[in-house]
Amino acid sequence: MRRLVLAIVILLGINISNIWAGNSSSNSSNVRYVKAPRFARPLLEKWISEYSKTQPGIEFQIAKGGQDDIDLNVVFDNQGVNTEGFSRAVVYFGEFAVLPITASGSEAAKVLEGKHLNSKKLKQLYFLNDDFDEDVKKIKQFEKLVIYSGSNATSVTSSFAHNFGEESSNFRGKRISGDDLFLTTALAKDPLGVSFNALPNIFDLKSRHIKSNLSIIGIDVKKSLESSFSDNATLDDLIGVLEEGKVQEVAVEKIGVSYNQADDAVNQFLQWVLTAGVKYNHEFGLLNLDNKLAQVQIDKVKNILTAQK
């Protein structure tokens, strides 16, 4: 009798363990992990929060630093090779802009004060190049300034460089590892430091004004636009100007989501992003795509959903 009771207890224990394991597997399969550069994470967090209200059964989370099980990867248009096993199937949801900056009140800011640098002069300031155009007078003051650029794979360094026809390996100065926020940290420590960054890292997203410790380096734009590229600019004014037309001295690049496996949950999330999530782009410092390109992205996801039915 005791043996029979013991056998029943063991069988019950095995069954309960299997149920728990099954539930655990089911729960983990409902989580999708998204990897993103830090400047885009506040937008991703907003998306995840809002999407969970419409689809509570599917959970999206921001991936941690060294995490391997990634379902979605936020990438830039210039990242044209497969990374971390992800395909080049990319759905673009917006654009980001990169501006030249220095620390407010620094010696570098004083050197650059009142200057309106065009593309050729910006190349001279930021890059190692002895083959500058002959019509560009060499500015000796630039030589004492220290350029800080990023070396991280998610840095906007390559976007800034490509806008001037340069490679990221051709920057003068020092390379900073880690997130691009460390570029502004470097400026705070070096009075001669000069760098660049994406708008969400330059502006306070709540006040919509430039962060008090930073200063935008003057660029050569039409007089009517000068205030939009000054330290008195608001984030929304600047975004509006950049959406109206390209400014040669400002790097603007598409940002999108690359995915490894496009299951129903991922595709439905992407469809929501393109139809509802993009309304938060401006709030978090990103530009919207033009209407034609935005529609192309919506159609792309719709076609994938249709093909899977």
Tell where the protein language model's regions lie, with residue ranges.
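Flexible loop residues that form catalytic
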Residues: 9, 78, 199-200
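Exported/periplasmic ABC-transporter solute-binding proteins
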Residues: 20-55, 63-67, 89, 101-309
